[in-house]
A protein has these predicted regions:
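Core active-site phosphate/anionic-ligand binding loop and the adjoining beta-turn-alpha structural block
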Residues: 219, 244, 252-253, 262-322
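Catalytic cores of alpha/beta
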Residues: 157-169, 214-230
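Active-site beta->alpha loop and helix N-cap motifs at the rims of alpha/beta catalytic domains
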Residues: 53-170, 174-177, 187
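N-terminal amphipathic alpha-helix/helix-capping segment at the start of soluble metabolic enzymes
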Residues: 1-24, 72, 77
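Hydrophobic faces of well-ordered beta-strands that scaffold small-molecule active sites
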Residues: 11-19, 47-51, 82-90, 119-120, ...
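Glycine-enriched alpha-helix->loop->beta-strand junction motifs that scaffold or abut catalytic
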Residues: 45, 115-117, 141-143, 171-175, ...
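Glycine-rich phosphate-binding active-site loops on the catalytic face of alpha/beta enzymes
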Residues: 121, 181, 227-244
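Terminal or standalone catalytic/regulatory effector modules within metabolic enzymes
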Residues: 36, 42-60, 290, 294-299, ...
Length: 483
């Protein structure tokens, strides 16, 4: 019989308050949906609850008419015994472009002041330079740094690559290392091998995040538990599986009586699940939670493309009347990814690679046109690409070798916080407001102006679709492109 390589209880982070509903219901769970369950969630004994960051910040203002900072303060008050965790996009903070170091620093400070304990910091390209400031600031203000490996598969992204990256992040001050398997590509045996190699190389805890899009998530978590992973992400059953995380209750029951027994109380989880089943049903009745997201999608395994990317690809092609080109685009995505130096397919690189692949196929000629985001990526504006870029493609985009950015992209940015404070002094009532306005200048002004108006509090805003002028809108997948 296989033996566990650790005898420590497996720690659990539950994503029910953040990634579970972001993955299944477009981040539409309200604070009112959460409040009735906070007391029981706080009593379960989780390592942490992921409850903020990612798309929640934008969605609060854009769709739910909520102040994201007030949501965080409310959660902190209702969860006094549980560490609160957020997802942070490195130099992008919670947006889709790079911000100056002083803005990153202020956002880390205010996140921690308002209740966050653990900040999971990732960069889409695994460029550690884009993590430097967020790591430094999180530590300065007393937060726990969970530095992230954005997991993917390519000729560049070997086990040795990720082990080396983890060691570098540990040396930069990471308090824990997260394996972020956003596309559910990390298979069970590979998870065992990677976790084992990491445990032999680094001394900080290892936290595994995956999804269950391809139906392998439960097995991946179990094999990681055998290999000695310290913490895993799961979601309470009403919003688990499919594009979300594997179910918390299932893993807790599986490990009961083993050396990795979590010690968590299933009966308390059952109480919480009763409430969240009602929330999930409400979201389903409203047409927000589509039952399709609960299905197993093995295309992820065949094409190494995230499940959400596939569904949005179909939507894009339908809009263009080009559904017959679906498999052509599927074949083109890995070719574009190779030409672009094998970026992991996570925001924003998934949008950029996907859009370029669609354009290449629809236009009948590869690289006939480049969206500005593709040019920015090839120019190095997002950071250093993991592999070698196809120089013919870069030249076709009008980028000469001397135009490629080789420094840390944020080094080209002057301090911005003072400018934002001056720009928004007529509307911002706090430094938190300044940060909201800086990150989401299209949506935050209207939200803040209406925040204290009772008429706007009656119901969540039925917000219009993001306009093309809004670079920071919540994105399903692709950068907007008119065929």
């Amino acid at each position: 019989m296989m033996e566990f390589l650790s005898n420590k209880p497996l720690l659990i982070t539950d994503t029910i308050l953040r990634d579970a509903h972001q993955s299944q219901a477009a981040t539409r769970m309200t604070i009112e949906d959460m409040l009735p369950a906070l007391e029981v969630l706080d009593s379960i004994g989780y390592y942490s609850l992921e409850c903020w960051g990612g798309a929640t910040f934008d969605a609060c203002m854009r769709f739910l008419n909520e102040d994201p900072w007030e949501r965080l303060r409310t959660l902190k008050k209702g969860l006094p015994n549980t560490k609160l965790q957020m997802l942070f996009r490195g130099q992008n903070i919670l947006g889709y472009k790079h911000y100056a170091d002083d803005v990153v620093d202020a956002f880390c400070r205010k996140s921690i002041e308002n209740g966050i304990n653990i900040i999971r910091i990732f960069d889409a390209l695994n460029d550690v330079r884009n993590l430097e400031q967020a790591i430094k600031s999180t530590k300065k203000y007393g937060g726990v740094v969970e530095a992230t490996l954005s997991y993917t598969i390519s000729p560049i992204h070997s086990e040795a690559y990720f082990v080396k990256l983890a060691k570098e992040l540990e040396q930069m001050g990471a308090d824990a290392i997260c394996i972020k398997d956003m596309a559910n590509l990390l298979l069970p045996m590979e998870a065992y091998s990677l976790v084992k190699a990491l445990k032999e190389t680094i001394s900080v805890p290892i936290h595994l995040h995956t999804h269950n899009t391809s139906g392998t998530g439960d097995m991946t978590l179990l094999m990681a538990a055998y290999a000695g992973v310290d913490i895993v992400d799961t979601a309470l059953s009403p919003m688990a599986n499919g594009t979300s995380q594997p179910a918390t209750e299932s893993l807790v029951a599986t490990l009961r009586g083993t050396p990795r027994d979590t010690g968590l109380d299933l009966s308390k989880m059952s109480d919480a699940a009763v409430h969240f089943r009602k929330v999930a049903q409400r979201l389903q009745d409203a047409g927000i939670l589509d039952p399709k997201v609960l299905r197993v999608d093995t295309n992820t395994l065949l094409y190494q493309v995230p499940g959400g990317m596939l569904s949005n690809l179909i939507s894009q092609l339908k809009q263009a009347g080009k559904e017959d080109k679906y498999y052509d685009v599927l074949a083109e995505i890995p070719r574009v990814r190779k030409d672009f130096g094998y970026p992991p397919l996570v925001t924003p690189s998934s949008q950029i690679v996907g859009t370029q692949a669609v354009m290449n196929v629809i236009m009948g000629e590869r690289y006939k046109a480049f969206p500005k985001e593709s040019k920015a990526m090839l120019r190095g504006e997002y950071g250093k690409l993991p592999g070698e870029v196809n120089e013919e493609v870069r030249a076709k985009a009008g980028i000469a070798p001397e135009d490629v950015i080789t420094c840390r992209p944020a080094d080209q940015l002057e301090p911005e916080l003072k400018k934002y404070k001056e720009e928004f002094k007529g509307i911002a009532k706090s430094e938190e407001d300044v940060l909201s306005l800086a990150l989401f200048p299209q949506v935050a002004p209207k939200f803040i102006a209406n925040r204290d108006n009772p008429a706007t509090q009656a119901a969540p805003a039925a917000a219009p679709a993001p306009t093309k002028a809004d670079p920071n809108a919540v994105r399903e997948l692709y950068v907007e492109y008119k065929f």
